[in-house]
């Protein structure tokens, strides 16, 4: 089973992934997505419930959330609210400076207090325009012994599964069947495997990237933003 931990549905204003089509695609491709809409908790029976939460000092994702977290809270208040739910704190594209709310821009990633909250670091985001932000995330996760994960950051249906982790031992009918703690333990096992492959990634990232996922391009990202705005405006969504 493939797990893509960073997927947006049409609930995110920057996405064109209808829920029904998303479900059919994921079932066909044997993908369990984590739906991480911007500042909205979207619960779907085929997906891990998540939310990409904007705060006053960057953004992060809460996985296995039960309640929505409001946008633009103080960073630590938002982190506390996620932790109170027993959910996982996941750092998406933390070093991608092309993102307006990248955590690296707010100089919080090395704060001692912040480090106490983190469970998982996204070490491969397939929408990053270059390999460097992903390599920095990999080094950061290794430095602090955090679990590692991949996410496509899909905004279009054809992007879903561009980055994923394959769990041969994971076979669940509903993502709700899995507890956050159990899933984190599985990720830690996969993290050990990823570190063994790290040398190959560093030696030839442009070749190895196709094994881990597909990198986005600045042209695709520029195009998608225009397409999404035009389509949503015409459909009034």
From Swiss-Prot:
Pfam families for the chain: PHP_C (PF13263)
Gene3D superfamilies in the cross-refs: Metal-dependent hydrolases
A single MF term (Gene Ontology): 5'-3' RNA exonuclease activity
Protein name (database record): Uncharacterized protein MJ0417
The species this protein was found in: Methanocaldococcus jannaschii (strain ATCC 43067 / DSM 2661 / JAL-1 / JCM 10045 / NBRC 100440) (Methanococcus jannaschii)
